[in-house]
Swiss-Prot record:
GO terms for molecular function: calcium channel activity. Residues 689-700 have a biased composition (Low complexity). Pfam families: TRP. The lineage of its organism: Eukaryota, Fungi, Dikarya, Ascomycota, Taphrinomycotina. This is Uncharacterized membrane protein C1322.03. The chain crosses the membrane at residues 62-82, 188-208, 231-250, 257-277, 330-350, 373-393, 405-425, 458-480, 484-503, 515-535, 546-566. Residues 668-686 have a biased composition (Polar residues). The keyword Hydrolase does not apply. Its main location: cytoplasm. It comes from the Eukaryota. It comes from Schizosaccharomyces pombe (strain 972 / ATCC 24843) (Fission yeast). The keyword Transport applies. InterPro entries: TRP_C, TRP_Flc/Pkd2-like, TRP_N.
Length: 862
């Protein structure tokens, strides 16, 4: 039997209705106390309340409060007809943030009822202390009239006076009332869902289109095979970080502290972030009683004894509209999320196949790669829902039993403890560890766990998992003590700040360490603001509401930060695809907050082609002898050498006189062989003019140019062991529609460091000269504090007694280019070889024979 199309739409309608529909419950009581300025007077009867019961009429949307208490003495009741009638009365006033909202006056005899018979009125007069009675306080406004007060606490004050002309006060009590989110519930839910979708689309946009690791292959784009810091910078504070912060915000409402009910209602509207919302078949009206016949008049009893079921997880589940057995709707929502994750994984695989067809690219894939990618997507979902799994399943250990408790226990043991231990055993003993970053099998399955950490910090993923586990146990099991929960939350956030600030598991170029430290600091401030809400401190009234507003303000600021980073992500990737680049003038691509690097005024100036004659130092040259089409963009010279004449009297091209530390003058006519003329006192280098080097405007042979110095603050060191893939292949090799004028294959070494051609052997000859300053051996770093202190003392003494003369500061560096080497014929030196002893004897004998022969020829013959 085929599923009909309308059944699918009906299922989606039920899911979204459950996600975004408001809870149809009654208002909730926040606190109940006696007025601080009420002092019982002698001789006047008093009414001592000991319980509060709230009631709500679903038909006419009216609600009222029943206060149960004991009466001491006889209340004077004056009745009869006439214009001057005095009777015992009940005054009720409702305030919102100190402003009067409504007031009502009712005769006491009209609202007094028997607490044991319920809704049975007591006739006036009645005997003192004969029975307790209830005072019914009605509100003559419907619930819709209070919709604008859904995000605040309605403080109600009830005053009972007798029927005497003096109107003696019998009792005075205050309690807080919070209405359910009826109108603001969909607004908050839709707003957060749209924000999360916006962050998600920005991450997808950056993963596939960034100029470093962007690729048609979604496996490589999503799991970031190259571990490129620039790509990680664009994806920092993404979808997972946003969801985890929402889970933290929801967990604050699950702590047993005296939060106002409206704060818990707001966090309940975000409960879908913890895989729990009001599913229709498990929903029930929020009819939780604040205190049902709690004897507050007994001295041994205290207000804090009744808090565990008034705040924390109980109140949070009450705001959602489900019972304490929350594990069953949680598992149903998890099944829905599981199918959603499978659908997204299959959609990614389909897009991979579709893009390969469109661009005619052959993407090598195997069946194992596909299955491992699907399994890796499920692991992502598992870690995304790890905190609610631990929190809701562990809560069943202390919740009232409802049957089938073995299911949440087994779920907690398997998914809360066994799976993390199994993953640790699989990843901790992989040899070599680089296999985790190079093997596609590990990256497909487990890459989402550690692919944002550095290689030496790849096992740092254990720390956030341990923090999530401890936070879940805290809100699930330790609900009876709000102080203990606050202490554990404080320790966890301090550990987070120290871990990200000291261990620094992410690449420095990504700014993820700084951003995670900032988020942890915001969470720590939130926990500190929760401390005054401890039940033992009894902070009530407006002060408690202001603390809740401050915490909500922090949550809003963090959400705005996520939206700003997503906007910057969209704009930076779009600008780079359109041709913007920040590599010119040595500005690195890995700078944080690349928005200004793309659209800043300095970057816009660098993109303009400068006039070759705009430089004042080059305008002193004779322009008439040069062709403007053959001129290159001049760089900043130091000075111009004058009186440069050729042998025939013509003016020679101007020369640059560049100061150096240890390189002697080098010209075409000068010999590179050490001689007496090239002395160590030479400290300058004669180079050709910056107008002559080759450039896009000229094809002439260029020799050298001078690059001005850069401020040290604008250069950010990179990790030397990280390679960069700066070319977006599928955009550069595709039709003109996707092509852009950006060369991402420029090496960083060509930007920052002087380029020296290997064909120039003059540097090797210069290095052989005796006057070159060679680098001295660097002593090994000291091992302990004593050696460091001794090294400081030695360096200080050496600088005092052997102070060197001040040297001229370095003015930049010279980039040498290849030039035709002059063919210099060097005369070969005459070799003088000492003869051996036999050779000397033969040579002397030969000389003797020659002399005898000459003397013989010189004797005259007879």
């Amino acid at each position: 039997m085929k599923p009909r199309p309308y059944s699918v739409f009906l299922f989606l309608h039920i899911v979204f209705y459950s996600l975004l529909s408001a809870v149809n419950g009654s208002p909730s009581l926040d606190y109940f106390e006696t007025c601080s300025n009420f002092v019982p007077r002698a001789g006047i009867p008093t009414f001592s309340p000991y319980a509060v019961i709230k009631n709500f009429d679903e038909v006419n949307r009216m609600y009222y409060i029943q206060v149960v208490g004991n009466l001491s003495g006889v209340i004077t009741i004056v009745g009869g007809n006439g214009s001057h009638i005095h009777a015992a009365s009940v005054y009720s006033e409702t305030y919102a943030l100190g402003k009067l909202v409504t007031s009502n006056t009712t005769k006491l005899c009209d609202v007094v009822m028997d607490p044991h018979s319920f809704e049975v009125p007591i006739k006036c007069p009645w005997a003192a202390g004969s029975a307790a009675f209830m005072v019914k306080v009605p509100f003559k406004s419907t619930l819709s009239d209070y919709s604008k007060y859904e995000l605040t606490t309605l403080t109600t004050r009830v005053i009972v006076v007798d029927g005497t002309p003096e109107k003696n006060v019998i009792t005075c009590m205050k309690f807080g009332l919070s209405t359910t989110l009826y109108y603001f519930y969909p607004v908050i839910s839709y707003l957060v869902v749209v924000s999360l979708a916006y962050v998600s689309f920005s991450i997808i946009y950056a993963l596939f289109l960034n100029p470093w690791t962007g690729s048609l292959d979604p496996f490589k784009s999503i799991f970031n095979f190259n571990m490129d810091p620039d790509a990680l910078r664009l994806t920092s504070l993404g979808f997972f970080d946003f969801v985890q912060y929402l889970q933290f915000a929801v967990s604050t409402a699950q702590v047993s502290v005296m939060f106002p009910k409206f704060y818990i209602n707001i966090m309940a509207a975000l409960s879908w972030g913890t895989a729990l919302f009001r599913f229709p078949i498990f929903s029930e009206p929020a009819e939780y009683q604040f205190a049902d016949f709690a004897d507050l008049s007994v001295a041994s009893s205290s207000y804090a004894d009744y808090l565990p079921k008034s705040y924390g997880m109980y109140s949070f589940l009450d705001s959602i509209g489900i019972g304490t057995a929350c594990w069953l709707p949680f598992l149903i929502v998890m099944v829905i999320y599981l199918f959603a994750a499978l659908f997204v994984a299959l959609l990614v695989i389909f897009l991979k196949w579709l893009m390969s067809r469109i661009f005619n690219e052959t993407i090598a894939e195997t069946r194992w790669d596909t299955w491992s990618f699907i399994a890796g997507s499920l692991i992502r979902l598992y870690f995304l829902t790890y905190f609610p799994t631990v929190a809701y399943m562990s809560f069943q250990f202390v919740a009232p039993p409802t049957g089938y408790e073995i299911i949440p226990v087994l779920w907690f043991i398997f998914f809360g403890i066994f799976i993390p231990v199994y993953l640790y055993m699989n990843l901790a003993f992989v040899e070599p560890s680089s296999k985790l970053l190079e093997d596609q099998t590990y990256l497909h399955l487990f890459g989402s766990i550690y692919n944002s950490f550095r290689e030496e910090r790849v096992m740092f993923w254990i720390f956030p998992i341990a923090v999530q586990f401890m936070r879940g146990i805290t809100v699930g099991v330790i609900g009876s003590s709000g102080s203990a929960q606050l202490a554990i939350f404080f320790i966890l956030e301090v550990a987070n700040v120290v871990a990200y600030a000291y261990v620094r598991p992410h690449f420095p170029q990504t700014s993820m360490n700084t951003l995670n430290t900032f988020i942890s600091t915001m969470r720590l401030i939130t926990v500190i603001l929760m401390i005054p809400l401890d039940p033992r401190l009894k902070v009530l009234g407006i002060s408690r509401d202001l603390l809740a507003y401050a915490i909500l303000f922090i949550h809003i600021m963090v959400c705005i930060l996520f939206l700003l980073l997503s906007t910057q992500r969209f704009m930076e990737v779009s600008a780079r695809l359109l041709g913007a680049k920040s590599e010119s003038k040595g500005v690195p691509l890995d700078r944080p907050f690349g928005w200004a690097r793309v659209f800043g005024i300095n970057e816009l100036r660098r993109r303009r082609l400068k006039d070759p004659y705009s430089n004042g130092n080059t305008m002193m040259f004779d322009h008439s002898t040069y062709n403007s089409n053959e001129m290159s963009v001049p760089l900043t010279p130091v000075s111009v050498c004058s009186n440069s004449l050729k042998k025939d009297g013509e003016a020679a091209p101007p020369k640059l006189f560049v100061q150096t530390n240890c390189i002697p003058p080098v010209t075409q006519a000068s010999s590179l062989v050490p001689s007496k003329n090239n002395t160590a006192s030479s400290s300058s280098l004669m180079l050709d003019s910056p107008v002559t080097p080759s450039s896009p405007y000229s094809t002439s042979q260029g020799y050298s140019f001078y690059r001005p110095p850069k401020p040290k603050s604008s250069v950010r060191k990179r990790d030397m062991d990280q390679l960069r893939a700066l070319q977006l292949d599928f955009l550069n090799n595709k039709p003109n529609l996707l092509r852009h004028d950006v060369n991402y294959a420029v090496r960083e070494a060509d930007v920052y460091h002087p380029h020296v051609d290997t064909s120039i052997d003059s540097l090797s000859q210069i290095s052989s000269q005796p006057f070159e300053m060679r680098p001295t051996a660097i002593p090994p770093p000291p091992k302990n504090a004593f050696q460091r202190a001794w090294q400081i003392v030695q360096s200080t003494a050496k600088s005092i007694w052997h102070s060197d003369p001040p040297k001229e500061s370095e003015k930049g560096f010279v980039v040498l280019r290849s030039r035709p080497r002059p063919n210099l014929q060097k005369p070969l030196p005459q070799l003088h070889i000492e003869p051996s002893r036999d050779e000397q004897y033969s040579m002397e004998r030969k000389k003797t024979d020659d002399s005898l022969a000459e003397s013989a020829w010189s004797i005259p013959h007879p």
